[in-house]
From Swiss-Prot:
Keyword field contains RNA-binding: yes
Name of one Pfam family that matches: S4
GO biological process terms, semicolon-separated: translation
InterPro entries from the UniProt entry: Rib_uL2_dom2, Ribosomal_eS4, Ribosomal_eS4_central_region, Ribosomal_eS4_central_sf, Ribosomal_eS4_KOW, Ribosomal_eS4_N, S4_RNA-bd, S4_RNA-bd_sf
Lineage: Archaea, Thermoproteota, Thermoprotei, Desulfurococcales, Desulfurococcaceae
Species this chain originates from: Aeropyrum pernix (strain ATCC 700893 / DSM 11879 / JCM 9820 / NBRC 100138 / K1)
GO CC list: cytosolic small ribosomal subunit
GO molecular function, one term: rRNA binding
Domain S4 RNA-binding: 43-114
Identification of the protein by name: Small ribosomal subunit protein eS4
Transmembrane segments annotated in the record for this chain: none
HAMAP family referenced in this protein's UniProt entry, alphabetically: Ribosomal_eS4
């Protein structure tokens, strides 16, 4: 009989290149569970605990710590060691109070960046698309799988819907209360979340529209005045006058 569904296991050699694992030492790697982020843009919680934070030496130790509820992701205790952690997620070590944000980073693709206490319950999320639901209300579909409902009084004139695709919302986690709205456009500060310019931060200078998001070209200028280009699909706006989140030293002015 033919196999139905996907593989439940993942070979280390087939894991994404940016995963911090010893591919030639171990045959198998932890396969992320389906969740808010795709496997090619996330790290399983076990790898973060063991390989990045160094709180465990073995997978068994990491699974034990996770199952005991020592780690929160976006304000929620996660006990599944396969839970996928991706861009902009906030990881908290419950016992120490340490908080980190998962940021895109050059070459390594991901970096756990320490953040201050006041930033720990805030998260920027990108609007991927919008849908109209029953009653004429607008549902915002975000990059991490979340949905936020914008209620409108008159579906024929939805003045409450001021949001556009590719805009960024600053929300609380886990409450999902909207605290800020950053519009995508020229003059906005953005961080690149994919491609060869991953992790670079710059100001949007121009947008050359193409067929679809991936073929639309965005030109940005970094803090040193250097211009670079990338696909619109990789652009994640994080501020107007200044970034709304803390960044690694040297990433911005």
């Amino acid at each position: 009989m033919a196999r139905m569904g996907g593989q439940r296991r993942l070979k280390a050699l087939a894991a994404p290149r940016f995963w911090p694992i010893l591919r030639k030492e171990y045959k198998w790697a932890v396969k992320p569970r389906p969740g808010p982020h795709p496997a090619e843009k996330s790290l399983p919680l076990l790898l973060i605990v063991r390989n990045v934070l160094g709180y465990a030496q073995t997978a068994r130790e990491a699974r034990k710590l996770i199952s005991e509820g020592h780690f929160r992701v976006d304000g929620v205790v996660r006990k599944d060691y396969k839970f996928p952690v991706g861009f902009m997620d906030v990881i908290e070590v419950v016992d120490t109070g340490e908080k980190f944000r998962m940021l895109p980073y050059p070459v390594k693709f991901f970096k756990l960046h320490p953040i201050p206490e006041e930033e720990g319950d805030l998260k920027p999320v990108r609007i991927e698309n919008k849908t109209t639901v029953k009653g004429g209300h607008v549902q915002l579909n975000l990059h991490d799988g979340r949905n936020i409902l914008v209620r409108v009084k008159d579906p024929r004139n939805p003045v409450e819907d001021v949001y556009r695709t590719m805009d960024t919302l600053l929300i609380t986690v886990p409450g999902q209360e909207i605290k800020g709205h950053i519009k995508f456009g020229e003059g906005a500060i953005a961080i690149i979340v994919g491609g060869r310019n991953v992790g670079r931060v710059g100001v949007v200078k121009s947008v050359q529209k193409g067929w679809g998001r991936k073929r639309t070209l965005v030109t940005l200028e970094d803090a040193s005045g250097n211009l670079f280009q990338t696909s619109l699909d990789y652009v994640f706006v994080i501020g107007l006058d200044r970034p709304v989140i803390s960044l690694p030293e040297g990433a911005w002015k």
